């Protein structure tokens, strides 16, 4: 199929525990991101292209080696950044091919067009949202992006998926925000209806 959606695959990381959601997971790391975070964890993700453009069926064949681990542990496949929601049609196709019992998780900034959120909401069991900071000024200074787009998409995702399927990560970023900013972000997110949080200190490793 010439128009079959493909994913810009950088790497697969197997047998991960407690990092990308519950259970044993495989992280699918892709290229491409709409943000330009000042301290990007993996700067390769800002480059155009990727080592391989892979179809959903091809990816399934590579990750199904851990099928028993996924089923036994309540784990599955986590798509991470880059920004997986840039490839929402691919995600929907992968979901349709994946065996029952696999959990599909998406790590996302939500800095994408709204229609991508609508499609992705049908493709995932859980969303891990990296909101950076709820202050528009801090968000723009750190990411170069528009916080209002993220918030609008978060509201949309809450309506489509429900709070129980959303975990929001709020990092403490040296030189950009403070613990007080973290607490303020958490309070703002609670007012939106978010119930699951991960407040953590940012690591400068791999920079």
Regions found by a protein language model. Give the residues of each.
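Conserved AdoMet/S-adenosylmethionine-binding subsite of the radical SAM
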Residues: 64-68, 73-76, 80-81, 85-206
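Conserved H-D interstitial segment of serine endopeptidase catalytic domains
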Residues: 51
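N-terminal [4Fe-4S]-dependent radical SAM core
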Residues: 1-48, 65-73
């Amino acid at each position: 199929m010439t128009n079959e959606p493909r994913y810009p695959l950088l790497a697969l990381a197997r047998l991960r525990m407690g990092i990308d959601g519950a259970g044993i997971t495989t992280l699918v790391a892709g290229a491409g991101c709409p943000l330009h975070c000042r301290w990007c964890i993996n700067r390769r993700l800002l480059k155009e292209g990727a080592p391989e453009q892979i179809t959903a069926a091809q990816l399934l064949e590579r990750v199904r080696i851990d099928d028993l681990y996924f089923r036994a542990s309540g784990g599955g496949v986590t798509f991470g950044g880059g920004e997986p929601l840039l490839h929402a049609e691919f995600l929907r196709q992968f979901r349709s091919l994946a065996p029952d019992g696999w959990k599909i998780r998406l790590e996302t900034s939500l800095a994408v067009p709204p229609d991508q959120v609508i499609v992705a909401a049908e493709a995932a069991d859980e969303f891990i949202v990296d909101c950076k900071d709820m202050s528009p000024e801090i968000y723009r200074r750190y990411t170069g992006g528009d916080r209002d787009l993220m918030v609008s998409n978060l509201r949309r995702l809450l309506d489509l998926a429900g709070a129980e399927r959303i975990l929001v990560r709020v990092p403490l970023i040296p030189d950009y925000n403070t613990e007080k900013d973290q607490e303020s972000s958490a309070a703002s997110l609670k007012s939106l209806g978010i119930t699951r949080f991960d407040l953590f200190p940012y690591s400068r490793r791999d920079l």
